[in-house]
């Protein structure tokens, strides 16, 4: 899906929305990083996948991601642990918590971008809803909420 046909540049629109099929979080993250440049990335999801992690690793190897944190759900822990080695290559920190939220936060000196989505970091052909905002208040409100989740989580280390 051509993201430029769905969304305007981040600098032109502080709030953007999409409801439909064909939009995947990984592609959206790549589109955002093309505009922001190298940034810290926070991902919160119920579940993740090999495909998402492999794509995330490609973004990291292209030096688009500085620091990265993943917060996943405890109930999806079996799948998460099976993907842990790949996660180690992608993320500086991986946390398991009571989490069903699906957000991506992208931050550097010039941008604070928040993505709120109904989509897990998996692939499917179902309709999903996504909102992108560059509103600073929204970004930091979500970051504070994510920190609260992390404060009540378990960090995966060296499995």
Question: What is the predicted function of each stretch?
Answer:
Residues 1-159:
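PLD/PLD-like phosphodiesterase catalytic module centered on the HKD motif
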